[in-house]
Amino acid sequence: MLTCNDKINPKTLLEEIMALRPWRKGPFEISQIKIDSEWDSSIKWDLVKNATLLKDKVVADVGCNNGYYLFKMLEHGPKSLVGFDPGVLVKKQFEFLAPFFDKEKKIIYESLGVEDLHEKYPNAFDVIFCLGVLYHRKSPLEALKALYHALKIKGELVLDTLIIDSPLDIALCPKKTYAKMKNVYFIPSVSALKGWCERVGFENFEILSVLKTTPKEQRKTDFILGQSLEDFLDETDHSKTLEGYDAPLRGYFKMLKPSKR
């Protein structure tokens, strides 16, 4: 949990926090008020925080949401940090949080998507984190290309995406929704994802972890509006989504932009 002990009027603070719902990423604690977010993002952070060194590196978080991972990255001493997310509400959440967790104003927050990277930030970053974005893209290869071109030579990409459990080079293309999400287009097998990444130009594809999403990591709280993971799964068989697909399985990966291609 990210904690700040600044003394603030608790009633006013809580009103501001609740006005910014839903809180997807967190948790945070400000002046003893805990923002109990839908996702316990510390679980994902613990899986990727040691994937590569961030000290003195130029680092990006693509799909940064309210900045939870950016604030955690600050603890590792990067040279600079840039977050990218086109969402309006999540930027407002970041602007609310930053005075507590980025007091030196080291983080740059860009209201841009992955598709804007290669034009605005070509060959710019030593490390890019892209967590939970790829399956929302209608063209995952184009998204991977954008990430590739935004990296410096020998730069590293740390990627998290939904995957399917299959040895084949295939991807699931949900008909209408996946776990009630309308904006999920391609969920690859690990083998298919590796092929996509290699076609774009990445090398040294490494599996960091593969984990099922559980209610410990994603669940309904007072700080979100609406439903969460358990509402998206089959009531009688939690190994399946409501649509009958396999329940969410996530893969965490690291790869390198080589010096020559």
From Swiss-Prot:
Record-listed E.C. numbers: 2.5.1.-
GO biological process: tRNA wobble uridine modification
Annotated Gene3D superfamilies: Vaccinia Virus protein VP39
UniProt-listed Pfam families: Methyltransf_9 (PF08003)
Domain of life the protein comes from: Bacteria
Keyword terms of this UniProt record: Transferase, tRNA processing
Catalyzed reactions per annotation: carboxy-S-adenosyl-L-methionine + 5-hydroxyuridine(34) in tRNA = 5-carboxymethoxyuridine(34) in tRNA + S-adenosyl-L-homocysteine + H(+)
Catalytic class of the enzyme: transferase
GO terms for MF: transferase activity, transferring alkyl or aryl (other than methyl) groups
UniProt binding sites for carboxy-S-adenosyl-L-methionine: 25, 39, 44, 63, 114-115, 135, 250
Family, as annotated: Belongs to the class I-like SAM-binding methyltransferase superfamily. CmoB family.
Chain's role: Catalyzes carboxymethyl transfer from carboxy-S-adenosyl-L-methionine (Cx-SAM) to 5-hydroxyuridine (ho5U) to form 5-carboxymethoxyuridine (cmo5U) at position 34 in tRNAs.
Subunit structure: Homotetramer.
Name the UniProt record assigns to this protein: tRNA U34 carboxymethyltransferase
Native species: Helicobacter pylori (strain HPAG1)
Gene name for this UniProt entry: cmoB
